[in-house]
Each structure stands twice: as structure tokens, then as C-alpha cells.
């Protein structure tokens, strides 16, 4: 039973990383590119770094939302099926 719970915890961490990684990477890459652009042009405008990151994150969320939803629904179905095994 404990090994099954450990497998479940590991699967939870994997799914959490897989769902959050595209959004975080998009923000990271866009932030890095904007920072390099600001450093080379010596433009120090705060909104210049904030707005592209927000747009990139929203774009990635829109593109990956169906995949994220399917992954979460499959995981939820798996958890619901495992409830009797974990309890009993």
C-alpha cells in the first residue's frame, strides 16, 4: 500500500511539472530575450519586460490548455478509480 502511495505521489509531481513547465519556460525565455534586448539598447523601461512575458504566458496557456485539461482529467479519473484500493 505504501509503495502504491509513493507511486501516486511521484506521478503527481510528474504531472505538476509537465503542466507548469511550458508556461514557466515561456516566461523565462521571453524574459531573458527582453533582458538581453534591454541591455544592448540600454532601454530600462519596466513595462517593456512585463508585457511581453504576460503575452507569452497567455499565448502558451491558450495553446496548451486542451492538453493540460486532458492530462488533468485523465489523472483525476485515475485517482477516482484508485480510491477503493487505497481505502480498503
From Swiss-Prot:
BP-aspect Gene Ontology terms: bacterial-type flagellum assembly; protein secretion
Pfam families: Bac_export_3
GO cellular component: bacterial-type flagellum basal body; plasma membrane
Family note: Belongs to the FliQ/MopD/SpaQ family.
Role of this protein: Role in flagellar biosynthesis.
NCBIfam families on file: fliQ (TIGR01402)
Protein name in UniProt: Flagellar biosynthetic protein FliQ
Biological source species: Helicobacter pylori (strain ATCC 700392 / 26695)
